[in-house]
Regions:
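Positively charged n-region of N-terminal signal peptides that target proteins for export
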Residues: 1-4, 8-9
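Flexible low-complexity loop/turn motifs enriched in small/helix-breaking residues
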Residues: 9, 18-110
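Polar low-complexity intrinsically disordered regions
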Residues: 1-2, 16, 90, 118
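Short beta-strand edge/turn micro-motifs at domain boundaries
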Residues: 111-130
Length: 130
């Protein structure tokens, strides 16, 4: 009986791990910025990678990069709306698995130019808001 329970527990753990979003082979492109240092941009990308692994089951992040200073400036209201003083916008591409992904995404589809909006205050940690 103990062996059966152990096998079931192991199988459940494997299924849980398999359902996570994947960022293993994600490509990043450096984009010049007058607003943010490369370290700031990398921190924002890191926040989205964590978000993707935790919440984007059945998806594989393939590319992510800074959308540019103009795009971030055009989304300035997101900082104000969220009580922050900075906003950064990233764009990405990701693949959706045939099965096991969110029902709001099309199975087997590749999404491109997906926007991620993050905010922060006083140089703190980036927070994904949209």
């Amino acid at each position: 009986m103990k062996k059966v329970l152990l096998l079931l527990l192991c199988a459940a753990m494997l299924l849980t791990l398999a359902a996570c979003g994947s960022v293993k082979n994600v490509q990043t492109e450096e984009v010049a910025s007058e607003r943010y240092s490369q370290k700031d941009i990398e921190a924002a990308i890191g926040a989205i990678k964590k978000e993707f692994v935790r919440n984007w089951n059945g998806c594989t992040l393939t590319e992510i990069s800074y959308a540019g200073d103009d795009v971030s400036e055009n989304h300035r209201e997101w900082a104000e709306r969220n009580g922050a003083d900075e906003v950064i916008v990233l764009t990405s591409s990701f693949d959706v698995a045939e099965q096991g992904a969110s029902p709001s995404l099309n199975p087997g589809q590749t999404y491109t130019r997906w926007m991620w909006i993050l905010v922060r205050s006083e140089g703190g940690a980036w927070e994904h808001v949209d």
